[in-house]
């Protein structure tokens, strides 16, 4: 047991959370805010040097072990802080975004009566996430995994009076648990096959016995395939991948800073982190890796199509997150773990920026989230607008590819996203070509929905009717049309004379985090690309994730230019529909395809029918038929009923005549004696 | 110090509560009628005796050497008919005794609101504690049986007299179910004594290891014991007495029922079935696994549909006990350790959940879920406590609910992965019913005007919960402390089982 700065990074937020949470009645909101923010600040200040030492220094991976968590017959987990380039990357991502979100929340949550509780949850989340990324075995990973899950549950349902928030929180937790079902089985199988759950032991055993089989009877698979597959099921839940994505959009019920921190920058990327951490397993498991690729690519495209048709500003960004996570996964699936991690890194900046920017707009418009009721926000909120445009450019991956001797130049997303699309093109892994085309198509849609969001929110005339009625549906129950009729009236009365929105720019405590994140969105790519992806990648990663450097050079020009081309195309399309000819957008929104996309391919309806109603029906069946009719009916109640029946009839035997009784006794004695002799009871042994 | 070590600590722990009961009885006889303040004095006296029992059990714990093999603190006095008054503990029984003595004072605190015949209630509770502790330290089969069955009677009366509206039905159902199983066990006990010519449990274990019961006989003996323990635990399909008993029982009786009486079933499997009938245990493992998996899925889904808070938690107990049997009958070290851990953790968490129900029941006199809603608005501290134990029930890592679950599954996985795949769905279902319950009771706005004046936890309730909160978190974050302690017993059971399976 030793104490060190690395331990403080992880445990500091826990103590701050406990302090703020347990003593909130006595210390008040202000002190709770200061304590939690300061502790994250300390973690931040301690994390960056560690990370930069991997980037520019010559740090080696190291491990700090605290004490045994569980140790039963080789099933051993130790509370650890593992530091290598992978966890160091996550440390700076988590602490940076968390710190900025803490600061931002000072402004965003200023009116909330439960600020101390909010900051306590935020810090607890940060602790769990840090414990997750610094784990040295699968069980601590699982601990952090569930810890961030419960923090997410608490924060989505932070406004506990709202039924929709509570339902979203439960949905998030349960969907994640479906993933954890796979994760837990993966841990068990890893222990069963490799007799350990420590990363190094598992990876080296898997590498030493790559063809170890697992199965019963005719069902036999390679163990490493099965372990990788099961672990990925966990990642699908946490990172909201296709089939298990349904919770993420609903998670937007939480306060916006939470969406930025948990449901964009950090927690949802835990699945990507896990796949990269276990890259040495997926490396050996082409089928599982192919599955990762296909699911990731499908998610990237699917979520982008749904994002196109959403009206709630946060939901658009949420689907965008889902889609970008898909990119990260198919990058990992095709073996480009470094590209996946780099996209995770850059995405954290620009997606947190977009969420906090959206939060600023929502704040400025007094909690209006429906883009149909926005418009004309640029003028009253110029800084927010500028930051959102930077975020948008970074998200769509704007940049000029390398031409001849000139290196490419662009915003953060350009470096990471193009690297992913190119890796998919060059890979000959299962599903890689599918992933490439999904990636390119999704890039087109990303550009379209991002600009749609920017135009609908900031440009044109204000369409809202502030304070008039709040009975309108918030996206979820609303109609599929981008311009609901109910809001047609009265907006001119509320909009300012020049058509701009009656909004106010957010306070500086909210804007400064935006500016910092915008700086990251602009520069994170150009500064760190050489270390994550380029010439210094070997030195940076030091074998923590498998690298495939041999791809360079074989890339056709059209592949290099494809992302930029589709991005510009998406931009132009958005300009046409949402700036020049808004009537066309309304016409588009009346079509059945739009309704299909708006309703998210009807996943919620299908799941509700199968799982929710199914569970209720089976539960009732087991209870009312199984327990009450069959088990109790045949068991105790049946016995009771029949004994009542017999006792009624036996009563007739109670005649009251002594000789009847004595006669019965005689018969019984004879019968018993006969049985004893027959059975040999009492005979000498 | 060495003189202290030789005191008969187990006897003291076991019968100290009875001494308290006698004292109350004596006071009652002397007082001849109810004097003002009598009930209050009885409560305090009972609390003092149960706390003293806990302290003495800590002394016994201190005198116990977890590194030494076999049974310790042994007391063996010849008794009637050749049966011995024979007590002893290993680390398994030591932890269960500690669980019992730890929870009983909290139950007494939770019974403060009992107004009806306080003295009788407390006397029964004290006797019940003696019988429960006795079960775990009895080292003679007949003595074990007496304690095991004796526990039925006070519980029967507690439910039947202090229970809810359908208390008589519930009490009889409870009594008949458990008695039926026990009679079969009695027959098996007689048979075992006849075969092995001893009623001493350590001798029987040694006999099983060195001579061994005939495999064909083992089958019957195993089944007879199984009938008793399966009802007690309870396993599917003999579980339906539990929800009824819980619903009707007063809060503290529910706590004891869930936390300790159920554990006697698991204890029995570990003490008798596995080490004494290893080949039969091995033979029946698929059946036990199947019943466990059915219990987990079935009870979870049924719990999801309950409208009564206690019934929901009772069904969740059935599901959690499924993990216990899964772990125990894997026969692996991880599984047995997981089973033991799950029993301890369930003792604390389900006990605490029943106390949580008791808190609002005391205020509103209903357990109907639909009656509540939005409690967090009026009772934030209660809501936080309830949240913690809900998460424990869900098996969240960091609470005591997690290590037992994962270890049981890891152990069982090594025997049969397919059953474990099915059982692991329990981690999904537990979240479904537990979080739904929490939402319906604690979250949202207060819709029911009757809840408008409901008050948060008072000092007594807070004192009741704090030890449970601390235990849940310590057992969740540093389970290796407990696991290290129980490893000796778990290892010897696993060894005995493994030795008997492969002759």
Provide a role label for each language-model segment.
Chain B
Residues 1-11, 23-123, 198, 202-206, ...:
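Transmembrane helix-loop-helix hairpins at membrane boundaries of multipass inner-membrane proteins
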Residues 11-30, 47-60, 97-111, 128-129, ...:
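Central hydrophobic cores of alpha-helical transmembrane segments in multi-pass inner-membrane proteins
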Residues 38-51, 169-179, 379-382, 459-467:
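Alpha-helical transmembrane segments and their helix-start/interface "positive-inside/aromatic belt" motifs
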Residues 48-62, 178-189, 392, 428, ...:
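Hydrophobic alpha-helical membrane-insertion segments
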Residues 106-114, 130-142, 155-442:
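Hydrophobic transmembrane alpha-helices and their helix-loop junctions in integral membrane proteins
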Residues 111-124, 251, 259, 450-460:
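Cytoplasmic juxtamembrane regions at transmembrane-helix boundaries
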Residues 149:
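Short phosphate-coordinating micro-motif centered on Lys-Gly-acidic
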Residues 379-381, 435-503:
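Cytoplasmic/organellar membrane-interface segments at the starts of transmembrane helices
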């Amino acid at each position: 047991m030793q104490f060190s700065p690395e331990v403080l990074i992880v445990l500091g937020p826990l103590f701050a959370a406990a302090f703020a949470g347990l003593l909130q009645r006595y210390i008040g909101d202000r002190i709770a805010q200061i304590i939690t923010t300061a502790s994250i600040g300390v973690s931040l200040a301690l994390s960056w040097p560690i990370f930069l030492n991997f980037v520019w220094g010559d740090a080696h991976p190291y491990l700090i072990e605290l004490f045994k968590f569980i140790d039963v017959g080789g099933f051993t987990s130790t509370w650890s802080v593992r530091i290598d380039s992978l966890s160091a990357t996550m440390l700076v991502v988590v602490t940076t975004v968390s710190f900025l979100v803490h600061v931002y929340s000072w402004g965003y949550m200023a009116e909330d009566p439960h600020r101390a509780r909010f900051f306590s949850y935020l810090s607890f989340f940060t602790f769990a996430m840090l414990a997750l990324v610094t784990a040295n075995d699968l069980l601590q990973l699982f601990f952090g995994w569930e810890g961030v899950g419960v923090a997410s549950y608490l924060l989505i349902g932070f406004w506990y009076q709202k039924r929709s928030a509570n339902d979203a929180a439960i949905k998030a937790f349960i969907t994640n648990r479906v993933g954890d079902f796979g994760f837990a089985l993966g841990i068990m199988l890893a222990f069963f096959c490799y007799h350990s759950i420590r990363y190094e032991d598992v990876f080296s055993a898997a590498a030493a016995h790559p063809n170890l089989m697992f199965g019963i009877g005719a069902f036999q698979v390679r163990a490493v395939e099965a372990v990788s597959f099961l672990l990925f099921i966990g990642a699908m839940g946490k990172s909201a991948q296709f089939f298990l994505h349904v919770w993420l959009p609903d998670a937007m019920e939480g306060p916006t800073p939470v969406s930025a921190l948990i449901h964009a920058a950090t927690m949802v990327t835990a699945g990507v982190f896990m796949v990269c951490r276990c890259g040495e397993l997926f490396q050996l498991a082409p089928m599982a890796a192919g599955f990762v690729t296909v699911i990731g690519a499908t998610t990237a495209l699917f979520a982008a199509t749904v994002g196109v048709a959403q009206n709630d500003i946060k939901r658009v960004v949420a689907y965008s997150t889902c889609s970008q996570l898909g990119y990260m996964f198919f990058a990992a699936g095709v073996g480009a773990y470094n590209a996946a991690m780099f996209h995770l890194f850059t995405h954290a900046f620009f997606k947190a920026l977009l969420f906090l920017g959206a939060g600023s707009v929502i704040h400025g418009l007094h909690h209006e989230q429906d883009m149909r009721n926005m418009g004309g926000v640029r003028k009253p909120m110029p800084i927010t607008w500028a930051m959102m445009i930077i975020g948008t450019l970074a998200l769509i991956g704007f940049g000029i590819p390398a031409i001849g001797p000139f290196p490419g130049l662009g915003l953060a997303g350009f470096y990471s996203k193009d690297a992913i699309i190119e890796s998919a093109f060059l890979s000959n892994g299962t599903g890689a070509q599918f992933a490439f085309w999904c990636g390119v198509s999704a890039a087109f849609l990303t550009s379209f929905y991002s600009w749609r969001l920017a135009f609908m929110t900031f440009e044109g005339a204000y369409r809202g009717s502030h304070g008039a009625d709040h009975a309108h549906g918030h996206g979820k129950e609303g109609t599929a049309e981008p311009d609901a009729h109910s809001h047609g009236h009265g907006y001119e009365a509320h909009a300012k004379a020049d058509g701009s929105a009656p909004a106010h720019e957010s306070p500086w405590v909210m804007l400064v985090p935006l500016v910092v994140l915008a700086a990251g969105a602009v520069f994170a790519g150009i500064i760190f690309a050489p270390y994550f992806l380029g010439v210094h990648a070997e030195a940076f990663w030091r074998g923590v994730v498998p690298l495939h450097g041999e791809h360079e050079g074989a890339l056709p020009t059209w592949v290099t230019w494809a992302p930029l081309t589709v991005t510009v195309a998406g931009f132009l399309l958005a300009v046409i529909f949402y700036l020049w000819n808004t009537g066309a957008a309304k016409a588009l929104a009346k079509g059945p395809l739009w309704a299909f996309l708006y309703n998210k391919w009807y996943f919620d309806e299908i799941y509700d029918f199968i799982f929710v109603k199914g569970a209720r029906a089976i539960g009732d069946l087991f209870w009312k038929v199984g327990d009450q009719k069959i088990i109790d009916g045949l068991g105790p109640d049946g016995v009771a009923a029949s004994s009542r029946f017999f006792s009624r009839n036996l009563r007739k035997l109670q005649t009251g005549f002594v000789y009847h009784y004595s006669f019965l006794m005689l018969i019984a004695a004879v019968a018993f004696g006969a049985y004893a002799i027959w059975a040999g009871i009492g005979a000498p042994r | 110090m060495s003189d202290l070590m030789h005191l008969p600590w187990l006897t003291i722990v076991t019968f100290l509560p009875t001494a308290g009961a006698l004292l109350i009885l004596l006071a009652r006889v002397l007082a001849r009628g109810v004097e003002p303040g009598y009930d209050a004095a009885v409560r305090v006296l009972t609390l003092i005796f149960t706390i003293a029992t806990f302290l003495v059990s800590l002394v016994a714990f201190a005198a116990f050497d977890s590194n030494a093999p076999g049974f310790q603190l042994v007391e063996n006095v010849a008794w009637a008919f050749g049966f011995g008054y024979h007590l002893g503990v290993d680390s398994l029984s030591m932890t269960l005794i500690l669980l019992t003595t730890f929870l009983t004072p909290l139950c007494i605190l939770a019974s403060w609101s009992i107004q009806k015949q306080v003295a009788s209630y407390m006397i029964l509770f004290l006797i019940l504690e003696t019988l429960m502790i006795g079960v775990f330290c009895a080292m003679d089969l007949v003595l074990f049986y007496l304690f095991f069955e004796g526990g039925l009677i006070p519980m029967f009366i507690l439910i039947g007299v202090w229970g809810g509206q359908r208390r008589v039905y519930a009490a009889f159902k409870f009594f008949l179910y458990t008695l039926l199983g026990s009679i079969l066990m009695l027959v098996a006990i007689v048979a075992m004594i006849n075969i092995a010519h001893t009623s001493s449990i350590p001798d029987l274990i040694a006999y099983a290891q060195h001579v061994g019961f005939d495999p064909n006989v083992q089958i019957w003996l195993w089944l007879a014991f199984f009938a008793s323990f399966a009802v007690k635990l309870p396993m599917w399909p003999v579980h339906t007495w539990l929800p009824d008993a819980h619903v009707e029982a007063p809060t503290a009786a529910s706590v004891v029922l869930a936390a300790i009486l159920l554990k006697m079933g698991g204890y029995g499997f570990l003490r008798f079935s596995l080490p004494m009938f290893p080949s039969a245990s091995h033979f029946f493992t698929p059946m036990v696994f199947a019943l466990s998996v059915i219990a987990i899925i079935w009870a979870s889904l049924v719990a999801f549909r309950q409208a009564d808070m206690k019934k929901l938690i009772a069904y969740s107990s059935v599901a959690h006990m499924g993990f216990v049997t899964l772990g125990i009958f894997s026969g692996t070290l991880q599984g047995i350790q997981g089973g033991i851990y799950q029993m301890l953790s369930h003792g604390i968490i389900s006990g605490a959940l029943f106390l949580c129900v008791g808190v609002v029941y005391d205020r509103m006199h209903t357990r109907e879920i639909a009656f509540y809603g939005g409690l967090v608005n009026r009772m934030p501290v209660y809501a936080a406590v309830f949240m913690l134990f809900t998460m424990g029930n869900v098996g969240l890592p960091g609470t005591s609910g997690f290590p037992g679950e994962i270890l049981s599954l890891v152990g069982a996985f090594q025997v049969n992965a397919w059953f474990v795949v099915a059982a692991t769905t329990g981690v999904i279902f537990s979240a479904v019913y537990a979080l739904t319950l929490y939402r319906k009771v604690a979250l949202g706005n207060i819709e029911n005007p009757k809840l408008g004046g409901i008050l948060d936890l008072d000092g007594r309730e807070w004192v009741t919960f704090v030890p449970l909160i601390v235990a849940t978190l310590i057992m969740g974050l540093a389970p290796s402390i407990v696991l290290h302690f129980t490893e000796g017993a778990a290892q010897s059971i696993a060894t005995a089982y493994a030795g008997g399976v492969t002759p």
